[in-house]
Curated annotation (Swiss-Prot):
Keywords: Endoplasmic reticulum, Heme, Iron, Lipid metabolism, Membrane, Metal-binding, Microsome, Monooxygenase, Oxidoreductase. It is a peripheral membrane protein. It is found in: Endoplasmic reticulum membrane; Microsome membrane. GO terms for molecular function: all-trans retinoic acid 18-hydroxylase activity; heme binding; iron ion binding; retinoic acid 4-hydroxylase activity. Belongs to the cytochrome P450 family. It comes from Xenopus tropicalis. Its EC number is 1.14.13.-. InterPro entries: Cyt_P450, Cyt_P450_CS, Cyt_P450_E_grp-IV, Cyt_P450_sf. GO terms for biological process: retinoic acid catabolic process. Heme binds at residue 440. This is Cytochrome P450 26B1.
Amino acid sequence: MIFQSFDLVSALATLAACLVSVALLLAVSQQLWQLRWAATRDKSCKLPIPKGSMGFPLVGETFHWILQGSDFQSSRREKYGNVFKTHLLGRPLIRVTGAENVRKILMGEHHLVSTEWPRSTRMLLGPNSLANSIGDIHRHKRKVFSKIFSHEALESYLPKIQLVIQDTLRVWSSNPESINVYCEAQKLTFRMAIRVLLGFRLSDEELSQLFQVFQQFVENVFSLPVDVPFSGYRRGIRAREMLLKSLEKAIQEKLQNTQGKDYADALDILIESGKEHGKELTMQELKDGTLELIFAAYATTASASTSLIMQLLKHPSVLEKLREELRGNSILHNGCVCEGALRVETISSLHYLDCVIKEILRLFSPVSGGYRTVLQTFELDGFQIPKGWSVLYSIRDTHDTAPVFKDVDVFDPDRFGQDRTEDKDGRFHYLPFGGGVRNCLGKHLAKLFLKVLAIELASMSRFELATRTFPKIMPVPVVHPADELKVRFFGLDSNQNEIMTETEAMLGATV
């Protein structure tokens, strides 16, 4: 009995010693990790490196960032200020908030900083993508891609975008059950990208299969760049390979079959624009270009669409004010959008609708910020930003802390109205699409899509929350509901009366 007690005490002592050793090892390794990055400061600059934590060896604070969401940024900003250091996705990083700080970074492209996304993002988007190009190559690619988003191009996409949205809302309204808005918004924006932007003629089954692969790709675009079995990065690479194979097949079929087309889609324009600028695009460039177009049109637009629906649910007075504007501009008549009423210029003239979309993008900016690599050491907010480090300028936090916006946490479209124009008080206080020479090329298409969605929601649907409370919002990798946003949609006829489903009609007939 005594020996058994001794064995138990010995085992507990050994376990305690092991735990203490592990804790000491972690503490020492973490301290060495901090010193390793402190040693990278530019010795020729007297300013200190920004305050902050580099987390644990190799992984840094990546898991804190993923698990804490918006609290990660806000807690560190409160502790360290608008400029602080961290270590995310395998790279030392300085996060930057505030209009003046962001302005210096965006205006310093090519001489202070250069675009460089995390390694996983660079590898998965591909070497030929616009996002990964720099210097003269970037300028050339931007000219080629810019025609995709010209006024003429948007006008040609508009009827197709409207049709895709109308068909989707009819499906939502015909479903007697509630729908998961974020999931369905992802399917909607993916369908828009594939069928409208790229003009691919895929069956519903092929579209569904491609969507599943694409989701796996998107989920791992921002992952630790560790290429080992079962890692997110490896899953992303596998999804990219499958996508490129499917895209090559779709592109070849499209190039061979040009019959029955009534408009030039983005892929047509991209091919012709490449020829006009003296360089016919290779198949690899076309595949990378189409993948990037889908990626750009998908996640951020689905995020903003979900935020739009949620805010219209929360603020029915905003929805009614939208309807009044549509009626006043002869777009909405007897509860329906007048045929042929939607033109790009007409939509652009709807001032209140524009305010609503601007406020959605201010309060729920889908993208947290943009990545840059430091080309030469410079000063920011009293700190040195060392050469070779990465910088992430924060869009969302700059919006949240901008002094020009009153009641910053309140959804208030009127702040962008002609009487207030809060966004006019500072160029870099409001930047949902970035800024400088690398501002988002597709911003006008994204806003057009959101406006058409708002118009169609106002005209053909009544919708209500199917749960007792609204879900919490998560900001990583894009703004989205942490739990499902469940909503029931009801179709409306020309008199704004609900259209009953077949089952409801039968039940009504038996009463």
